[in-house]
Amino acid sequence: MSEMTPREIVSELDSYIIGQHSAKRAVAIALRNRWRRMQLGEALRHEVTPKNILMIGPTGVGKTEIARRLAKLANAPFIKVEATKFTEVGYVGKEVDSIIRDLTDSAMKMIRAQSIEKNRYRAEEMAEERILDALIPPAKNNWGQTEQTNESSPARQTFRKKLREGELDDKEIEIELAASPMGVEIMAPPGMEEMTSQLQSMFQNLGGQKTKPRKVKIKDAFKQLIEEEAAKLVNPEELKQQAIDAVEQNGIVFIDEIDKICKRGESSGPDVSREGVQRDLLPLIEGCTVNTKHGMVKTDHILFIASGAFQVSSPADLIPELQGRLPIRVELQALTTEDFERILTEPSASLTEQYQALMATEGVNISFSADGIRRIAEAAWQVNESAENIGARRLHTVMERLMEEISFDASEMHGTAIAIDADYVRNHLDELVADEDLSRFIL
């Protein structure tokens, strides 16, 4: 679980997302409150529930990007889902309970990786011994029984030294490695994924853990043996309990496109993929118990962050009960020309930096002048205003169009330096930007 302060979280998000300070502050406070809650006594901790967040803003302003970056910062079970993929219980499609099942699977993977890393040193020692046994097989007595290995024998120590120095990495040995589990592919109808995964687990466990001799390079065998030995040191039941605890205490669910499940106008008949989904989400967000293959999971303290553009609907179109369960509202602002300029240069691995690195692989040196970047930002903003406003995603389209000629000819331009200034941008983009019909379809 992350112990970063809200200021540190916002600073980290600033490295990737331009503007949207109020949204960054809201998620930073929510993330820090997870840590604060865990410092409380057990009785009070149980009473403190997370304040769920609703992020409102046009497409392409950073809602999903905030979720992606938050997942890396949280160091807690995290899952991002699209609200449009679910239908009401009893109809064909995914049920909302699968969100918690997927979150628990994600936690299992995270906790298993942490446990393996914790036991890595011991696993490496055991893997090393198995490779040395394959290189210097233990002697057998007159009755054909394997004698105890002499750990300090000169030959074994010599091979150990060579192994650690990497001299034997490319040498092939025959060694007993775990056989791949029986692969059974089952095509599941929508909504039956849980049953399918249980059937697959059952088939995989039928044969037990078998090994078979394989001839492999030592460096490849070493990696696999470390995984095998580390897995032996991990208690599966303990892992399950730790994963369930992590989900219940620190789990975060990000629900994207929640505006797409708002009811639109008066309609007769059941609305199974809109209002029905909202009603199914209510108990999940309020707190209920979900049955997963790893055990029962309580959702009382899972943090839910929902986001939507709300261009053809408003948050008031959500059912009142759901609105009440998303008490913190954050509005993200549409991007300006200045924001586009900053997006092109400031974030880590910005778009301009990416294109420079890609062209450098062909020996072409690309440089962007300040007036060139300003003109690219103006072109993107102009097209957003005249056509559909898709936010920062428009920059990808504009940049790809601008760089198309260079990208095509780069392999024949080794050693060339190209400066992209305002004149270069005007020559390549102005005609398209000025013609609304062309920009609508090409940009």
UniProtKB/Swiss-Prot annotation:
SUPFAM superfamilies: P-loop containing nucleoside triphosphate hydrolases. Its main location: cytoplasm. The keyword Signal does not apply. It is found in: Cytoplasm. InterPro entries: AAA+_ATPase, ATP-dep_Clp_protease_ClpX, ATPase_AAA_core, Clp_ATPase_C, HslU, P-loop_NTPase. Pfam families: AAA, AAA_2. Keywords: ATP-binding, Chaperone, Cytoplasm, Nucleotide-binding. One of its GO terms (molecular function) is peptidase activity. One of its GO terms (biological process) is proteolysis involved in protein catabolic process. ATP binds at I18, G60, V61, G62, K63, T64, E65, D256, E321, R393. GO terms for cellular component: HslUV protease complex. NCBIfam families: hslU, PRK05201.1. Belongs to the ClpX chaperone family. HslU subfamily. ATPase subunit of a proteasome-like degradation complex; this subunit has chaperone activity. The binding of ATP and its subsequent hydrolysis by HslU are essential for unfolding of protein substrates subsequently hydrolyzed by HslV. HslU recognizes the N-terminal part of its protein substrates and unfolds these before they are guided to HslV for hydrolysis. A double ring-shaped homohexamer of HslV is capped on each side by a ring-shaped HslU homohexamer. The assembly of the HslU/HslV complex is dependent on binding of ATP. This is ATP-dependent protease ATPase subunit HslU. The gene is hslU.
